[in-house]
């Protein structure tokens, strides 16, 4: 894992530190052959490969062993924060001696600035920044610039604009014991690095002064650096716990990076301001020629204010909109992103590529359409367009070697890969579920019989419907029939989701009904039956990819079965069934040849297969408190769970718990203190 909590000295070791997987088991099933094929492919010069791995085949472990084989810095891109956090935890466990970092959007809440011409309404940018995720982003870029053994797990934030890495390097501040430097000179240099002086609230990105002692809290670190002066000489440097004040170690040297990714040297800043002022004059003239004096005044006031802030502090709110001026780029060129912090040779792993690639492809156009209105109405200069995500073509150009990972890779991955490596046989020797087609006529009554059979065997059932109304009606019908059933819908928050999954695993409920049950966290060993209603209806929820993914929910149980309710066999059904049967035959033949007997995966009920799965979400009553005392007791329990969730990087879960705490405090008029507004940051172990 990352050692940014370790010594603050330059991180690059004298001897290259190799990637080394520390797993409690060896590759098994199809893993050894897949690892060899993929590693050999990259050594032979293949740029793009696909790992087609069925659910439960250990794709993450295979990727880890490939990284160990090819020894290259690696970027892993997931399609949402939750999945990214899950992968981050897994890679941290597999690479305990290497730098495993996490890079996602640092906004708990984000409303980008926008202008609605029809109603002449300007919506200002509104955001809530998660300080801990901000720290992790800085930790990621620092690791990439100071060491070679780095794995960064990211969301699509990886393709959004970031500061010029050359500025980030050039502005680094090196300190050594015995170095002659005036204390006030060092304070000025810290301000240039966008650190703020705060002698009271000592947080990341700040420093404080006490006589001849200076304490700096790096933006990316878990510990602070105490610098003790003797006259104009650095006498001693210590790494200290900022909360406890405990000295962790004595440091001979330290390397400090800027507190902002958009930090810029003074000379470059002045050149940027000159460019901005020149463009501003041109834009004012443009609006005046159009007779749009409101827009002319608006762009002048807003831009002038930003310029004054940059001149005074080297920074302004929304500085990213001037990023093209702050770097040596021309308008229209690709922005600097996280990818530019990687060396020339690195591996990009696109996880769940069938979902992640379309997401990457769609980012550019969505950003452009929003900014067009802002620029045309005088809220931003035209160079705001250059603060953007990469186009898909730019993303491909910036990535060196790529590995697409999915149980159902799309046509793009197949067409653009030098080879597709299949991982069909699971290390657990479980086979894909048997598939049966049943008539849609009388499907509810038939389903009820199947549910009764599974309940008698102490097994669980997942049911997926096409519409919200149908899911609600089915849930009500099953309840009236005496079934312990719950309904998971799109408004189910993360905390409720954890509770539902845990209840299903414990047997408090036997059936879970939903519309789209593909989200991560539903690989539940107790589920032996997946029922897909109206399976022959064409559409996204009944496409070949979705059907194969949904069928895979029953692949963790030795008795796994899938029933498709349909009156006709659609093309998607036919393809999905054929693929599942093909995989099942391969798995059964392998088990027969090697004498393996599959068994259901055993997993502690406290886990939910979500990031930080050691967090137990049960035990907190979701019922309303009857009085203030009970509310206080519930809040104490919730606060403990909120901290646990944040420690495990389950930020969405922590935010949901925070919202429940707020509701209880408001309902009973309880004092929330100063820390009720934010999700707590993970503790030192992080």
From Swiss-Prot:
InterPro entries: Helicase/UvrB_N, Helicase_ATP-bd, Helicase_C-like, P-loop_NTPase, UVR_dom, UVR_dom_sf, UvrB, UvrB_inter. GO terms for biological process: nucleotide-excision repair; SOS response. Residues 40-422 form the Helicase ATP-binding domain. Residues 632-667 form the UVR domain. Residues 668-677 have a biased composition (Acidic residues). It comes from the Archaea. A motif (Beta-hairpin) lies at residues 106-129. Residues 607-631, 666-686 are annotated as: Disordered. ATP binds at residues 53-60. The keyword DNA repair applies. Residues 610-624 have a biased composition (Polar residues). The keyword Zinc-finger does not apply. Residues 443-606 form the Helicase C-terminal domain. It is found in: Cytoplasm. One of its GO terms (cellular component) is cytoplasm. GO terms for molecular function: ATP binding; ATP hydrolysis activity; DNA binding; excinuclease ABC activity. Keywords: ATP-binding, Cytoplasm, DNA damage, DNA excision, DNA repair, Excision nuclease, Nucleotide-binding, SOS response. Forms a heterotetramer with UvrA during the search for lesions. Interacts with UvrC in an incision complex. The beta-hairpin motif is involved in DNA binding. Belongs to the UvrB family. The UvrABC repair system catalyzes the recognition and processing of DNA lesions. A damage recognition complex composed of 2 UvrA and 2 UvrB subunits scans DNA for abnormalities. Upon binding of the UvrA(2)B(2) complex to a putative damaged site, the DNA wraps around one UvrB monomer. DNA wrap is dependent on ATP binding by UvrB and probably causes local melting of the DNA helix, facilitating insertion of UvrB beta-hairpin between the DNA strands. Then UvrB probes one DNA strand for the presence of a lesion. This is UvrABC system protein B. The lineage of its organism: Archaea, Methanobacteriati, Methanobacteriota, Stenosarchaea group, Halobacteria.
């Amino acid at each position: 894992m990352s050692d940014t909590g370790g010594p603050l000295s330059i991180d690059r070791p004298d001897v290259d530190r190799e990637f080394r997987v520390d797993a409690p088991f060896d590759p098994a099933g199809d893993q050894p052959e897949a690892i060899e094929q993929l590693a050999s492919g990259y050594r032979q010069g293949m740029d793009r490969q696909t790992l087609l791995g069925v659910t439960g085949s250990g794709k993450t472990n295979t990727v880890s062993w490939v990284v160990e084989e090819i020894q290259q810095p690696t970027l892993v891109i997931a399609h949402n924060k939750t999945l990214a956090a899950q992968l981050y935890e897994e890679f941290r466990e597999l690479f305990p001696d290497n730098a495993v970092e996490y890079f996602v959007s640092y906004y708990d809440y984000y409303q980008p600035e926008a202008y609605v011409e029809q109603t002449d309404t300007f919506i200002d940018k509104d955001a809530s920044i998660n300080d801990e995720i901000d720290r992790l982003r800085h930790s990621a870029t620092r690791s990439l610039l100071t060491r070679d053994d780095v794995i960064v797990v990211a969301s699509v934030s990886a393709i959004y604009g970031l500061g010029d890495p050359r500025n980030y390097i050039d502005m680094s501040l090196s300190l050594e014991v015995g170095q002659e430097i005036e204390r006030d000179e060092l304070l000025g240099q810290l301000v240039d690095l966008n650190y703020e002086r705060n002698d009271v609230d000592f947080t990341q990105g700040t420093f404080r002064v006490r006589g001849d002692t200076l304490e700096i809290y790096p933006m990316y670190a878990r510990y602070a650096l105490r610098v003790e002066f003797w006259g104009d000489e650095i006498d001693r440097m210590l790494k200290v716990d900022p909360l406890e004040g405990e000295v962790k170690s004595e440091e001979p040297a330290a390397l400090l990076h800027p507190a902002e990714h958009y930090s810029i040297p003074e000379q470059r800043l002045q050149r940027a301001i000159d460019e901005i002022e020149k463009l501003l004059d041109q834009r004012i003239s443009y609006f005046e020629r159009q007779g749009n004096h409101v827009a002319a005044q608006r762009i002048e006031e807003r831009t002038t204010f930003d310029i004054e802030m940059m001149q005074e502090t080297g920074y302004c709110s929304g500085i990213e909109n001037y990023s093209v001026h702050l770097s040596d780029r021309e308008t229209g060129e690709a922005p600097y992103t996280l990818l530019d912090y990687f060396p020339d040779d690195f591996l990009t792993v696109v996880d769940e590529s069938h979902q992640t690639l379309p997401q990457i492809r769609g980012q550019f156009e969505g950003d452009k359409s929003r900014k067009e209105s802002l620029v045309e109405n005088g809220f931003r200069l035209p160079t705001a367009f250059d603060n953007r995500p990469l186009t898909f073509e730019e993303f491909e150009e910036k990535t060196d070697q790529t590995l697409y990972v999915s149980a159902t890779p799309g046509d793009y991955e197949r067409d653009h890969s030098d080879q597709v490596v299949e991982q069909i046989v699971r290390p657990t020797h479980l086979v894909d579920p048997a598939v049966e087609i049943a008539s849609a006529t009388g499907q509810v009554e038939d389903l009820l019989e199947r549910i009764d059979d599974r309940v008698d065997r102490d097994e669980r059932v997942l049911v997926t419907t096409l519409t919200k109304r149908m899911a609600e009606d089915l849930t009500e019908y099953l309840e009236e029939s005496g079934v312990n059933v719950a309904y998971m819908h799109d408004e189910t928050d993360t905390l409720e989701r954890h509770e539902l999954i845990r209840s299903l695993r414990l047997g408090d409920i036997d059936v879970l009904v939903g519309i789209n049950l593909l989200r991560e966290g539903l690989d539940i060993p107790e589920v032996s039956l997946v029922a897909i209603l109206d399976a022959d209806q064409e559409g996204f929820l009944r496409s070949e990819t979705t059907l194969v993914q949904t069928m895979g929910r029953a692949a963790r149980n030795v008795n796994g079965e899938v029933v498709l309710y349909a009156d006709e066999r659609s093309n998607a059904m036919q393809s999905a069934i054929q693929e599942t049967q093909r995989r099942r035959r391969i798995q059964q033949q392998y088990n027969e040849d090697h004498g393996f007997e599959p068994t259901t995966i055993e997993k502690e009920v406290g886990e939910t297969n979500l990031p930080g799965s050691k967090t137990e979400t049960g035990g907190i009553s979701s019922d309303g408190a009857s009085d203030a005392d009970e509310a206080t007791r519930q809040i104490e329990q919730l606060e403990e769970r909120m901290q646990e969730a944040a420690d495990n990087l389950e930020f969405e879960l922590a935010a949901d718990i925070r919202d429940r705490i707020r509701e209880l405090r408001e309902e009973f008029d309880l004092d929330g203190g100063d820390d009720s507004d934010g999700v707590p940051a993970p503790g030192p172990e992080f």
